[in-house]
Amino acid sequence: MTTDGGGWLLVMNVITGSSHYNQLSLMTSYRGISDYHSNKMVISTSAMKELYGDLNFQQIRFHCRKHSVGRTFHVVTAANSSGNAVVQYFSGLTDVEPVSCGSYVRMEDDNSELARRCSEWNYGQAGKWSRTGKGWKNTVQRLYNHAAWIYGQYHWDLVDRNSFECDDMSASPSSGDFWKVFVR
């Protein structure tokens, strides 16, 4: 992948329109990411930790687009301590939810509300990545269950509602909508 200088490894890939795309295939070892062509592959936090141990990646890139919404969320963790905190969190090396503002760089095609309004992320506009709350499987689902979200408005979510969310809340899906995560 040549985005932002290249070197990206695809670790999560969900594309609507493929058969049974809403029946996600959870990879509990990073070795399962070779199944990316199924277009319904998500990766667990423990698999990210395993991958980090072997690859020591320094950045994570989040990219989703939902055609009915007309917006794209496309950010890369920043090459600074705030961006590193995001990498550490999504790799399961810490349980401290990282601050969102200053932790990422918006890519050229990003026109999302989420990326524009980082101080409003999480419950109570805490301005943090991820999701807190009871009943949430934070040890498994960090990358695909509310990785970034503004309560009741704009979400990155492949768990809570059947119409997966990308910078929206419950908008209708279209064939070709996608959610991808890369590391390098």
Report each predicted region and the residues it spans.
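Mature extracellular or lumenal effector domains of secreted proteins
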Residues: 1-184
